[in-house]
């Protein structure tokens, strides 16, 4: 029985991932600051490990009994305006978790076999212009900096012989939370709008495939390094809106000028709402991972019908 410890288990991806792994008969422990919140949102079979993100020795005791660590911990990127204070929280919440996981691993005698390190396609910058594989360099912007530091926060564990996989995730589409319900709501109420010219690249992945890809990495012991967790067919932003509108039988007739979106503090307009990212999951494809939802229309129709 593979023993998995998840940091960030109560988030949108973490909750669904935890449920899937439990259903597949893995032993799952969720690390959390607030036990009550975790108990309310997670399957009752999940072991809850309350940790204050300070006591390294206590965490090391848990990791002694762990085969796989999945680190998804970090403050929500798009939930609040990017004030200086919130940007610092976004950064610190990621770096602190990674560094403390690393210190705890260094204290263990019997080390885990694998660490899956969360990241995002923001690593490539907010205007990629061309398609990015895992070999593409780091781009510009706040999210590029954050994801780079997040990835670096656990890189030392490789010197201890652990397998490490970095998952650079795109826009995850699911009906239980995340960005999808927020994106479709304006279209449902006949106020759908294209953002800017609508030509921006939108690199997405269905939540089902996000979870399946993570399990794929766990099961295939030869896999390590960087993986783009995106569907193989990114689309233009306006095509995403058009696809949702068609599924809902609604029009998209409004347009929000880019100049207005760029007024949002902290460059959030450029990096979140106008991001132009064309990202390809080359490493998953090279290792014969099969997507359940490779095309946007299939993904959107499934989510709306569910």
Residue ranges and their predicted role:
Residues 119, 152-175:
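Conserved beta-loop-beta element that borders a ligand/cofactor-binding pocket
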Residues 271-306:
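C-terminal amphipathic/interface module of NAD(P)-dependent oxidoreductases
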Residues 4-24:
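N-terminal Rossmann NAD(P)H-binding glycine-rich loop of SDR-like oxidoreductase domains
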Residues 99-141:
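Conserved Rossmann-fold NAD(P)-dependent oxidoreductase catalytic core, especially the SDR/UDP-sugar
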Residues 184-192, 200-234:
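Alpha-helical substrate-binding/gating segment
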């Amino acid at each position: 029985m593979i023993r998995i410890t998840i940091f960030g288990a109560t988030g949108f991806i973490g909750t669904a991932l935890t449920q899937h792994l439990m259903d597949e008969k893995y032993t799952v422990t969720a690390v959390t600051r607030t036990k009550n919140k975790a108990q309310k949102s997670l399957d009752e079979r999940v072991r809850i490990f309350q940790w204050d993100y300070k006591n390294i020795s206590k965490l090391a005791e848990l990791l002694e009994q762990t085969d796989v660590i999945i680190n998804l911990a970090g403050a929500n990127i798009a939930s609040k305006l990017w004030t200086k204070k919130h940007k610092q929280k976004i950064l610190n919440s990621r770096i602190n978790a990674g560094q403390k996981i690393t210190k705890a691993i260094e204290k263990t005698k019997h080390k885990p076999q694998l660490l899956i390190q969360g990241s995002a396609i923001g690593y490539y910058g907010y205007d990629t212009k061309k398609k990015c594989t895992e070999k593409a360099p780091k781009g510009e912007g706040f999210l590029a900096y954050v994801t780079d530091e997040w990835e670096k926060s656990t890189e030392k564990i490789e010197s201890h012989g652990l397998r490490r996989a970095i998952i650079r995730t795109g826009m995850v589409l699911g009906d239980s939370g995340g960005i999808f319900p927020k994106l479709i709501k304006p279209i449902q109420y006949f106020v759908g709008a294209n953002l800017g010219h609508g030509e921006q690249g939108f690199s997405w992945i269905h939540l089902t495939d996000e979870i399946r890809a993570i399990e794929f990495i766990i099961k295939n012991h030869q896999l390590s390094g960087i993986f783009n967790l995106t569907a193989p067919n990114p689309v233009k932003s306006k095509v995403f809106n058009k696809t949702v509108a068609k599924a809902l039988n609604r029009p998209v007739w409004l347009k929000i000028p880019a100049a207005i979106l760029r007024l949002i503090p902290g460059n959030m307009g450029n990096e979140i709402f106008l991001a132009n990212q064309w990202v390809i999951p080359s490493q998953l494809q090279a290792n014969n991972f099969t997507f359940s939802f490779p095309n946007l229309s299939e993904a959107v129709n499934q989510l709306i019908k569910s």
